[in-house]
Amino acid sequence: YLQSAIRSVAFSRLWAMPQVEGYDTIVIYGDREHFSNVDYFTGYDARWEETLLILPRHGRPSILVGNEGIGYVKKVAVDIEVEFFQTFSLMGQPSDRSPRLKEILERRVVYDGGKIGVIGFKAYDASNHTVGGFITDVPHYMIETLCQVVPRDSLENATLLMADCRYGLKHCVSAKEIVIFEAAGTRISRGVLNCLRHLKPGMRE
């Protein structure tokens, strides 16, 4: 219930933002340490793998998952199409049953002459760096593959759509979401308190 209540409006909320004007598709990268942006829309935790969430303005969203994720993603409570991309798995695991990244992106990324937003971990001020143009922390091979599908100059770091303190989706919550977060936090803290109150010398896990 918590997942569906929060995320049922996440996609429409994104595309209703004035800051997404001109974007054809938003591509969101996540991994073990940085999956909150993907989680915001889907509830999916990449665990020890990587993941890529593709959100076209027109069309169904899709998510790329690895060997472990192909089973875990079934628990996602939103309507989303799943692409099996084994390169996102841990090293040494099978990688012979999924298409190449370019083939997937050609099917999933919608480009109508607008911008392609790329969301990674951080937004970057170009004035602080000696590299020009598009700056992102999304893995290089993914960006280069994306550039085989859409023009390089269409890419734009769109991380502020999630993280900007003034308008970022993760910083602007509804009254309903506040209630849900408070209820979840209270339930967890009570569970911890209950555990501590019942600890006794000599107890084992």
Short names for language-model regions:
Residues Y1, P201-E205:
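Short, intrinsically disordered, charge-balanced linker/junction segments flanking boundaries
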Residues R187-P201:
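Solvent-exposed, amphipathic alpha-helical segments
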Residues Y1-R190:
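A composition/biophysics-driven feature that prefers long, compositionally simple stretches
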